[in-house]
Swiss-Prot record:
The gene is yfiB. It is found in: Cell membrane. A lipid is attached at C19 (S-diacylglycerol cysteine). Residues 1-18 form the signal peptide. It comes from the Bacteria. This is Putative lipoprotein YfiB. The keyword Cell cycle does not apply. One of its GO terms (cellular component) is bacterial-type flagellum stator complex. Belongs to the outer membrane OOP (TC 1.B.6) superfamily. It comes from Escherichia coli (strain K12).
């Protein structure tokens, strides 16, 4: 009799445990932390385009000290919730050859990833980078303001 009761109880407890697991890749605390910095969700990924606060000068990939501090503060807060993996997508405006822009955008992604790793105190190997050049503008390249907005790094939070 006891043998017949054990199997249904085990099965029921497994079902209930599965129902209690968090939905999606991220916890509510992680989602709240990402939203507090302006990250937006699209197709299950959370990303932030660092164009408003952290712009790069034309033909440059160096971070200003205040930009570096902003990145490190954000990384520390997100890492404190367990978000320790990300992808940095570097971008440029439309000036220059494709190969030059791809290299420059990769340098931008790498400098942001270095600051992110330092601020979050996470291994640099947890962060991937890619240089996308001028392929994905977010603003018109016909104006100086639009070109400035396109010189950016987008941070995409990933899972291990």
């Amino acid at each position: 009799m006891i043998k017949h009761l054990v199997a249904p109880l085990v099965f029921t407890s497994l079902i209930l445990t599965g129902c209690q697991s968090p939905q999606g890749k991220f916890t509510p605390e992680q989602v709240a932390a990402m939203q507090s910095y302006g990250f937006t969700e699209s197709a299950g990924d959370w990303s932030l385009g660092l164009s408003d606060a952290i712009l790069f000068a034309k033909n440059d990939y160096k971070l200003l000290p205040e930009s570096q501090q902003q990145i490190q503060t954000m990384a520390a807060k997100l890492a404190s919730t367990g978000l320790t993996h990300a992808r940095m997508d570097g971008h440029t405006d439309n000036y220059g050859e494709d190969s030059y822009n791809e290299g420059l955008s990769l340098k931008r992604a790498n400098v942001v990833a270095d600051a992110w790793a330092m601020g979050g105190q996470i291994p640099r190997s947890n962060l991937t980078t890619q240089g996308l050049g001028k392929k994905y503008p977010i603003a018109s390249n016909k104006t100086a303001q639009g070109r400035a907005e396109n010189r950016r790094v987008a941070v995409v939070i990933t899972t291990p």
